[in-house]
């Protein structure tokens, strides 16, 4: 196994921000996740329509968008495709039958 400077267990938003900031300063980072996808509660999935992605467990991104992590990483994240869709109706509850509240 290759030596790394930091091993981070889990891949939720805090872990990924820590990994990105450590990597940006030149440290080597290994993120270990037990699930088959990264993101924790920030995971994005196609739930309703093909091509329309939902952040299924995230209630709000306000703390991230207004915090220092987004200030430090926002431009890099945008280069990799991150964009936010702002709406007057930012939340919904999807029912198993396809209806939404």
Report the location of each language-model feature.
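N-terminal glycine-rich phosphate/pyrophosphate-binding loop and immediately adjacent elements
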Residues: 3-101
């Amino acid at each position: 196994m290759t030596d790394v400077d930091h091993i981070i267990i889990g891949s939720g938003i805090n872990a990924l921000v820590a990994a990105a900031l450590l990597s940006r300063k030149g440290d080597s980072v290994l993120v270990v996740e037990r699930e088959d996808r990264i993101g924790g509660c920030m995971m994005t999935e196609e739930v309703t329509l093909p091509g329309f992605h939902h952040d299924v467990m995230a209630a709000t991104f306000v703390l991230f968008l207004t915090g220092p992590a987004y200030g430090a990483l926002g431009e890099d994240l945008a280069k990799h495709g991150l964009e936010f869709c702002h709406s007057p109706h930012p939340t919904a509850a999807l029912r198993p039958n396809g209806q939404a509240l």
